[in-house]
């Protein structure tokens, strides 16, 4: 048996993914696949067709074909057995036998095809072996990773212990009326998650560099951020110890890229034929001395129906809001029905909702100056010292039912004074020298982690650290409004539906 190519194509002969096992040009394989639909005889139940030069062995898969192109003298029974294995491989990687899904997983399919056939000849493998080979599962790699994770945990514990010692030394020095030595960025050792490398690199603060790159390295003058005082030797010894345990100490920019690359994206929503998107956006302005100047929140329920048989439905809305939200339905929605029974349905029950389009059926608005309504309070306390400012920032979650993700608190910094010296910190930080900002990053703020603080020192005046800006995203909405049930107008039978909830920031400032 000599297998020339394996391909998944449409019924019109358009190639979606194709793997050639012998040398063959793209024009040649596209021509063979384009000719394939014209050769099939719908009146016969054969699963192969032949031309003067090649044989097509195929299997229909809904709107697609799995096609093997072989030489004419190949064993047709072996070809059919190989075709069945190819057809079983595709559902392993694709959730649906559709063109978009095949294209999205084309490389996974090609890797699997290569495990089945090598140089035109069938390999003696089964489906389980193909799955194992493509996953490249290795016991040695698992052992190595386990050892690596243990070393990282030990290094983090050592860093936390060292940070506490340095912080205690600083407090003792302040009690005695002495200036505490700068401790660099070791406060960032309390970071949760991410690689150890990204945490350690924050302790290495770059000095101001000359603008001319090719010039020989020259000292640019002492930098306050590098004055580690009597503790400098201990810091160097600690970094050397981490290196001996297998840690790579790299530049701070590389560390930032590493920590950013490790962010895990949320999995895609599994959308049903009836899908609802609940979205809220908040605009908030607070004063630095306390007091809510303005808070405005806008929310909306967007309905999307992808199957016209579910066009005539009603949404059961549960409103547990106690903050005085103003609700407004779409003009085509029966307002009396919503007011009396909290049901969203069309005024004319014989009509259907639009299909394959997002329709806003309910929106709400909340505007207030009540401080107790602030979801996340931020207190920034800059105090002038002899060499600049000591800044303390605290956050506290006031809405315990919320879970805020990817929280970033951005503090402006004065320009031309170098990097800040970080003391205590919950979470991690990034210093953007181009935009002169310090970003305090917290992966999650919830009822278990509802408060935290950041301390840093830098030259400047108290007004230099405002306005403080906040951004976050949440999968729980602020105004507890949910769709609990969807039923059809006729028969009141329940309908499966999916919901996607997002609560995000439009503008969140402390002036």
Swiss-Prot record:
Residue(s) carrying Phosphoserine: 223, 244, 493
Gene3D superfamilies assigned: 3.30.450.60, Mu homology domain, subdomain B
N6-acetyllysine: residues carrying this PTM: 233, 241, 309, 351
One GO term (biological process): cerebellar Purkinje cell layer maturation
Annotated stretches, region: Disordered: 168-196
Bias (Basic and acidic residues) ranges: 168-177
Compartments where located: Cytoplasm; Golgi apparatus membrane; Cytoplasmic vesicle, COPI-coated vesicle membrane
Pfam families: Adap_comp_sub (PF00928), Clat_adaptor_s (PF01217)
One annotated Gene Ontology cellular component of this protein: Golgi membrane
Residue ranges of domain MHD in the record: 271-511
Assembly and oligomerization: Oligomeric complex that consists of at least the alpha, beta, beta', gamma, delta, epsilon and zeta subunits.
Protein's name according to its UniProt entry: Coatomer subunit delta
Gene symbol of the encoding locus: ARCN1
């Amino acid at each position: 048996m000599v297998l020339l190519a394996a391909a998944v194509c449409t019924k019109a002969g358009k190639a979606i993914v194709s793997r050639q096992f012998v040398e063959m040009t793209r024009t040649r394989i596209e021509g063979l696949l384009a000719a394939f639909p014209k050769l099939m005889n719908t009146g016969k139940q054969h699963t192969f067709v032949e031309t003067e030069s090649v044989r097509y062995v195929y299997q229909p898969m809904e709107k697609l074909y799995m096609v093997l192109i072989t030489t004419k003298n190949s064993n047709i029974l072996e070809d059919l057995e190989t075709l069945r294995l190819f057809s079983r491989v595709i559902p392993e990687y694709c959730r649906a036998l559709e063109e978009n899904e095949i294209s999205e997983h084309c490389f996974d399919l090609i890797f699997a095809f290569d495990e089945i056939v090598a140089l035109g000849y069938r390999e003696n493998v089964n489906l389980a072996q193909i799955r194992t080979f493509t996953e490249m599962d290795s016991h040695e790699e698992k052992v190595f990773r386990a050892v690596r994770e243990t070393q990282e945990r030990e290094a983090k514990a050592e860093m936390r212990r060292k940070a506490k010692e340095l912080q205690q030394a600083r407090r003792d020095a302040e009690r005695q009326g002495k200036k505490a030595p700068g401790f660099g960025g070791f406060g960032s050792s309390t970071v949760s998650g991410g690689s150890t490398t990204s945490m350690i690199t924050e302790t290495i603060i770059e000095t101001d560099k000359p603008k001319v790159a090719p010039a020989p390295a020259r000292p640019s003058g002492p930098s306050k951020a590098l004055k580690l005082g009597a503790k400098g030797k201990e810091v160097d010894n600690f970094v050397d110890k981490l290196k001996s345990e297998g840690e790579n100490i790299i530049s701070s920019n590389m560390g930032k890229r590493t920590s950013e690359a490790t962010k895990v994206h949320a999995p895609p929503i599994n959308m049903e034929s009836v899908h609802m998107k609940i979205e809220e956006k908040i605009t908030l302005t607070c004063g630095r001395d306390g007091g809510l100047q303005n808070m405005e929140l806008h929310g909306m329920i967007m309905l999307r129906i992808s199957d016209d048989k579910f066009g005539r439905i009603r949404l059961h809305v549960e409103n547990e809001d106690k903050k005085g939200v103003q609700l407004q339905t779409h003009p085509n929605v029966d307002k009396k029905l919503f007011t009396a029974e909290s049901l969203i349905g069309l005024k004319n029950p014989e009509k259907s909702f639009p299909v394959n389009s997002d329709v806003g059926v309910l929106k709400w608005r909340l505007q207030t100056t009540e401080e107790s309504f602030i979801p996340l309070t931020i207190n920034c306390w800059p105090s002038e010292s002899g060499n600049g400012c000591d800044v303390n920032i605290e956050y506290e979650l006031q809405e315990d039912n919320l879970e805020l993700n990817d929280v970033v608190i951005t503090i402006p910094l004065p320009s031309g004074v170098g990097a800040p010296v970080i003391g205590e910190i919950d979470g991690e930080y990034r210093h953007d020298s181009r935009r002169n900002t310090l970003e305090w990053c917290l992966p999650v703020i919830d009822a278990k982690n509802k408060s935290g603080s950041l301390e840093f020192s830098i030259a400047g005046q108290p007004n230099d650290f405002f306005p403080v800006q906040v951004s976050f995203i949440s999968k729980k909405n602020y105004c507890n409004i949910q769709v609990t049930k969807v039923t059809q107008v006729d028969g009141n039978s329940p309908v499966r539906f999916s919901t996607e909830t997002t609560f995000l920031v439009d503008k969140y400032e402390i002036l």
